[in-house]
Amino acid sequence: MSTSRKLKTHGMRRGKNRAPHKGVKRGGSKRKYRKSVLKSRKRGDDASRNYRSHL
């Protein structure tokens, strides 16, 4: 149970914190980065959504 819980928090934390942080760090080429981020973000959202539904 502990491992499952840890994994869930880690996944959520990683997806929510990692993307915005990267964008903020790379303020210079925000426009260029945004395009790739949009694709990755969409995929991540879908994955997390499916993961949540399964749980």
UniProtKB/Swiss-Prot annotation:
What is one cellular component GO term in this UniProt entry?
Answer: nucleus
Tissue specificity remark: Testis-specific.
Database matches in Pfam families = TP1
Q: Which UniProt keywords apply?
A: Chromosome, Developmental protein, Differentiation, DNA-binding, Nucleosome core, Nucleus, Phosphoprotein, Spermatogenesis
InterPro entries reported in the protein's UniProt record: Nuclear_transition_prot1, Nuclear_transition_prot1_CS
Which residues are reported to carry the modification Phosphoserine? 36, 40
Task: List GO molecular-function terms, semicolon-separated.
Answer: DNA binding
Q: Where is the composition biased (Basic residues)?
A: 1-42
| Cell location | Nucleus; Chromosome
Q: Which GO terms describe its biological process?
A: chromatin remodeling; flagellated sperm motility; heterochromatin formation; negative regulation of DNA-templated transcription; nucleosome disassembly; positive regulation of protein processing; sexual reproduction; single strand break repair
Give the knockout phenotype: Reduced fertility in males. Testis weights and sperm production are normal but sperm motility is severely reduced. A significant proportion of Prm2 remains unprocessed. Male mice lacking both Tnp1 and Tnp2 are completely infertile, but protamine alone are capable of histone eviction. Chromatin in mature spermatozoa shows defects in density.
Give the region (Disordered) as residue ranges.
1-55
Biological role: Plays a key role in the replacement of histones to protamine in the elongating spermatids of mammals. In condensing spermatids, loaded onto the nucleosomes, where it promotes the recruitment and processing of protamines, which are responsible for histone eviction. The histone H2AB1-H2BC1/TH2B dimer is required for loading of TNP1 onto chromatin.
Family, as annotated: Belongs to the nuclear transition protein 1 family.
Q: What is this protein called?
A: Spermatid nuclear transition protein 1
